[in-house]
């Protein structure tokens, strides 16, 4: 049976059609609806996803199963979406609404869980029995995979590492709290820290690292804060879960600094006499999420 994976992102919605042996036979990307009110955005997202599924199914000569990766998660109490930074989804019955539109059951999981699943299944973490997948991009998230199965937890929030508090009086987070990990080591969080220190507004993380390498004092200090926050945040995961490996994804996973200076920033906070956990870059790139969504049926 062929499978369809859908990845609902902040800027794009991607769909793939997979064969039984996990070969991608078609891929479609469309922009995520923007600049409209929440109700209109939600309806537009439903339409976009349904249209993608219809197009992918047209090229499948057998029955398909559909998996969807999305920011946030489904409440086990209400069946409604919660904790999504695509805020138009919160409080909506996404699964039921999609199933009604396309006339079949769908499986939905948090996008970070889908990322982690794909990397554990046949990506950077395939040789390890337990994987913690970290997404560091526009936001920060995580997913726990044990023996190629998502560990979602009793409330469906396992791995929501980005909303652990790191600084009691840190920057405001969209979730209503302050000093969440996401506000400090996401791309926007890194850039905002540099700007608050007097740096050039609108600088990307790669820009800031380049400025630091060229002697910009504000950038040097901002990079040091970023790495300190990264080290403390990742160490908290290792001390609790002790995964066999950690795989980094999202735009910031392309920063080489994370794999040497970032690793060294973790070590002082590990409650052990040695730090052997591999910190790996993802193998599937920005396709990790959409592949993981398709693997929800495995």
Language-model segment annotations:
Residues 31-34, 89, 158-160:
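A short acidic/small-residue loop/turn micro-motif
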Residues 86-91, 107-113, 133-136, 280-287:
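Active-site nucleophile and cofactor-binding loops and adjacent substrate-binding regions
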Residues 109-123:
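Conserved PLP phosphate-binding loop immediately N-terminal to the Schiff-base lysine helix
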Residues 126-184:
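Glycine-rich phosphate-binding loop of actin/hexokinase-like ATP-binding domains
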Residues 7, 67-71, 109, 133-139, ...:
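Short beta-strand segments
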Residues 1-65, 75-78, 96-106, 121-128, ...:
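ATP-binding/phosphotransfer module of carbohydrate and carboxylate kinases, centering on a glycine-rich
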Residues 65-85, 89-93:
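Gly/Ser/Thr-rich active-site cleft segment
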């Amino acid at each position: 049976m062929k499978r369809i994976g859908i990845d609902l992102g902040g800027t794009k919605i991607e769909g793939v059609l997979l064969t039984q042996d996990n070969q991608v036979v078609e891929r479609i990307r469309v922009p995520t609806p923007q600049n409209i009110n929440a109700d209109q955005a939600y309806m537009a997202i439903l339409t976009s996803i349904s249209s993608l599924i219809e197009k992918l199914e047209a090229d499948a000569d057998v029955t398909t199963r559909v998996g969807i990766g999305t920011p946030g998660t489904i409440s086990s109490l209400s069946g409604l979406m919660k904790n999504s930074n695509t805020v138009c989804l919160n409080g909506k019955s996404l699964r039921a609404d999609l199933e009604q539109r396309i006339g079949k059951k769908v499986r939905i999981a948090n996008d970070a869980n889908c990322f982690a699943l794909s990397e554990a299944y046949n990506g950077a973490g395939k040789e390890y029995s337990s994987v913690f997948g970290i997404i560091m991009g526009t936001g920060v998230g995580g997913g726990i995979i044990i023996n190629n199965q998502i560990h979602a937890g009793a409330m469906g929030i396992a791995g929501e590492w980005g909303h652990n508090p790191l600084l009691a009086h840190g920057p405001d987070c969209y979730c209503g709290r302050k000093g969440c990990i996401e506000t400090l080591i996401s791309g926007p969080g890194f850039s905002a820290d540099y700007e608050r220190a007097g740096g050039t507004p609108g600088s990307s993380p790669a820009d800031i690292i380049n400025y630091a390498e060229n002697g910009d004092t504000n950038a040097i200090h901002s990079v040091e804060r970023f790495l300190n926050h990264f080290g403390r945040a990742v160490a908290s995961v290792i001390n609790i879960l002790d995964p066999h490996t950690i795989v980094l994804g999202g735009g910031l996973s392309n920063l080489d600094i994370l794999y040497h200076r970032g690793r060294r920033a973790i070590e002082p906070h590990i409650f052990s006499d040695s730090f052997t956990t591999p910190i790996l870059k993802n193998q599937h790139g920005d396709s990790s999420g959409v592949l993981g969504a398709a693997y929800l049926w495995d």
